[in-house]
Amino acid sequence: MWTFIGTIGSAAGLTPTQVGLVLAAATVCGIIGAGGAALRGTQRADRLPVWLGYGLLIVSVGLLIGQPLLVRYAIAALLFKFTWTFVLPFILARVAGLDSNGRLMNSINLVIGGGMAAGPALAGALLQHFASADPLLAAAGVCALLSLILIAAASAAGKS
């Protein structure tokens, strides 16, 4: 989804300058999110960062539906970039906690890389097939929700 965030802004009628400024600010928010995750650390066993992160990620995707004007687009992009860089370390910490022999963590980069390669191809096909980005955004929201469910289920099973 992030690969096409500029396209979503352009389709909503935003100028290239507006989109560029939002993406620059979003990058700063991403740095802040990563810093926040580093400051918080993963030593606490609570689930708040994962639940909050996924919730805000899904909200940010939802804000992009329906060709948002500048303010909604900016909020969505800033929130998405902040939240993704904040929640990812906590997701990876959950996965590491489930890994008893190192194989899962060894393959996680392959899975992330595969998603980064396949995601834009699938998203591009959706954008080409439909008149708006809304189906892509709905699919992204569903994928985030499924990921949350899988992380929660695996974490609960790992504690049994």
What residue spans do the PLM features occupy?
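Extracytoplasmic gate region of multi-pass secondary transporters
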Residues: 1-24, 31
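Intracellular helix-loop hinge segments at the cytoplasmic ends of transmembrane helices
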Residues: 7, 81, 88-98, 102
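Transmembrane alpha-helical segments of major facilitator superfamily
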Residues: 20-30, 80, 108-112
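Hydrophobic/small/kink-forming positions within alpha-helical transmembrane segments
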Residues: 28-32, 62, 82, 113, ...
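Helix-to-loop junctions at the C-terminal end of transmembrane segments
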Residues: 32-46, 127-128
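C-terminal transmembrane helical hairpin of 12-TM major facilitator-type secondary transporters
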Residues: 44-91
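A late C-terminal transmembrane helix in Major Facilitator Superfamily
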Residues: 99-132, 140
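Symmetry-related core transmembrane helices of the 12-TM Major Facilitator Superfamily/SLC fold
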Residues: 135-153
